[in-house]
């Protein structure tokens, strides 16, 4: 282990702890690393050009995930595999959103690998669209996690539309 790796590990431990928030962040980072490893093996061409902006979009999410995990660690410290308890279930929901984001990044890497293995495709390739849809799911989960941070308003579920009672005039 080099000096920079050692210093990064200490910085991560101080900022993210050793519990569920650190694990959620690390899961996201590993999925992102895997996505970029697969991207590096794509042949030059249209598919690579379509995929690079998606890779950049995913990479831009890592600091946001780190900020969410650090804020969660500061507000509800975790040093084990147990999600901290809360009356309103906020920490469970936040952890669920971060976990879903990490899983969605892994699915992005999987979709990219499947696209790579299937070879070249015609313009308007549906396989590239699959990767794009998965990236959109990652963005959605990260935004959901950010919305659950303390100090941000909880999204209220929309009230169901109840039809007005009909006047029974006889």
Describe these PLM feature segments.
Residues 1-55, 59:
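Leu/Val/Ala/Ile-rich N-terminal alpha-helices, chiefly Sec-type signal peptides and the beginnings
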Residues 23, 27-34, 50-53, 57-60, ...:
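Charged, amphipathic alpha-helical oligomerization/scaffolding segments
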Residues 35-46, 65, 69-86, 112-123, ...:
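Secondary-structure edge/capping motif, primarily at the C-terminal ends of alpha-helices
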Residues 45-82, 100, 107, 153-170:
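Long, charged/polar, soluble alpha-helical segments
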Residues 49, 85-89, 128:
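Non-catalytic sensory/regulatory segments that transmit input signals in bacterial signaling proteins
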Residues 81-95, 169:
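Hydrophobic multi-pass inner-membrane translocation pores used for secretion
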Residues 112-170:
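C-terminal amphipathic alpha-helix
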